[in-house]
Amino acid sequence: MVTPTFQVPGLSSQPKDYLDVPWDMFGELCRALALRVARDYQPDLVVGIARAGVIPAAVVASILRVDFYSMKISRKEGDEQVRERPAILSAAPTQAAGKRVLLVDEIATSGETLRMALAAVRDVRPVEVRTATSFARTQGYKPDYFALETDATVIFPWDRKIFEEGELVVNPRYASVLDE
């Protein structure tokens, strides 16, 4: 895969270990991802992997003007990791049968979640299924399509501030690197 041909404002000024993604940058990445997919593949529907993968999946589906569905695969319940390996918590949509499917997650690291989702979607018997993520790592699993390659810890706009004790606060995981 080639890296995106668009410039991301503010990207070069960020700490190398973290990539703080504001909503406008996320939108640009989704548009770039949708364009990359559309140049090579015409999915009939998009399946997003909950929880975070449904966000780029819904945006990409909207841009591509196709139906959107979700499935849930996770190691977590809420914000707490409760499993060593990801588990399928809601099945692949049966609407994928006989269709060209684009399977979307927010990031590909080890690829374990995407591989599990890919197998589950294939069990529904689509015509074809391809994978896409907003971000991919330089090493490890590569989806068929991704918007940006980085080894930085990605701070997604929906995870930057969280609801805690009755108010929105900077996510404690990122407080030391965010200027707020």
Q: For each predicted feature, which ranges?
A:
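Active-site-facing substrate-recognition patch
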Residues: M1-P43
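Conserved PRPP/pyrophosphate-binding segment of the phosphoribosyltransferase/PRPP-pathway fold
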Residues: E28-D79
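Conserved glycine-rich SAM-binding loop
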Residues: A52, T109, T113
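Short, glycine/charge-rich flexible loops or terminal/linker lids adjacent to PRPP-binding catalytic cores
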Residues: S62-L102, E112-A119
